[in-house]
């Protein structure tokens, strides 16, 4: 039914062949957007829970965490990642005013160059997050050097940054989930579906 609706010109044979050879990305595209996707109430509850349990889960800050989010229905996931980042910043500001601990947070994902519907919101969100990061860590990254930015974020997550100024939590869509070694990272927060090899490699 999904492929008939999406591709009315496709033959039954072509649809059947597509179904029999579906990739993980195809399955993700078929998932209807969840009521949790880009739902600010959900985001606030998740962030609230992370702060509430942070001292215990991080062993009083000895360890840090990775947070991955992804939305279904063939929609861009980057706005959701930015929504989480903005909520962490909002809560950090409130907590700082109350004299409570805050969490050094960053978000990283690939810059969009596909001229798609979500390109502007993706790149604006990334640029905004980079400005917060630059202010926090004394860096000067922009959209012209996102690769260097991601490398710097990774060094602060795996605690190899030369200045010793490290991150508590990094929000990603797909980056850093595989092939990334961070001995002091003990928690993976997951607000998405993870399947097959990605599930195994992420954990």
Which residues make up each language-model segment?
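Generic amphipathic alpha-helical segments used as scaffolds and interaction surfaces in large
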Residues: 30-41, 72-75, 140, 144
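Helical mechanochemical/support elements of P-loop NTPase systems and associated helical scaffolds
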Residues: 42-46, 80, 149, 195-198
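Conserved RecA-like P-loop NTPase helicase motor core
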Residues: 110-203
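Conserved helicase motor "Helicase C" RecA-like lobe of SF1/SF2 P-loop NTPases
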Residues: 73-129, 173
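Short helix-terminating capping/connector loops at secondary-structure junctions
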Residues: 59-62, 96-103, 164-166
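Conserved RecA-like ASCE P-loop NTPase motor core of nucleic-acid helicases/translocases
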Residues: 63-72
């Amino acid at each position: 039914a999904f492929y008939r609706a999406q591709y009315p010109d496709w033959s039954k044979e072509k649809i059947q062949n597509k179904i029999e050879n579906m990739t993980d990305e195809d399955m993700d595209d078929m998932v209807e957007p969840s009521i949790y996707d880009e739902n600010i109430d959900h985001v606030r509850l998740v962030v609230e829970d992370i702060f509430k349990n942070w001292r215990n889960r991080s062993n009083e800050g000895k360890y840090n965490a990775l947070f991955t989010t992804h939305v279904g229905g063939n929609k861009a996931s980057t706005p959701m990642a930015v929504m989480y980042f903005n909520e962490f910043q909002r809560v950090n500001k409130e907590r700082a005013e109350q004299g409570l601990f805050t969490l050094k947070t960053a978000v990283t994902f690939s810059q969009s160059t596909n001229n798609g519907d979500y390109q502007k919101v993706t790149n604006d969100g990334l640029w905004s997050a980079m400005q917060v990061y630059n202010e926090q860590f004394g860096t000067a990254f922009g959209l012209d050097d996102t690769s260097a930015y991601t490398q710097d974020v990774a060094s602060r997550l795996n605690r190899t940054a030369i200045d010793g100024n490290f991150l508590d939590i990094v929000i990603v869509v797909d980056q850093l989930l595989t092939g990334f070694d961070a001995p002091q990272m003990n928690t993976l927060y997951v607000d998405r579906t993870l399947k097959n090899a990605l599930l195994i490699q992420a954990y």
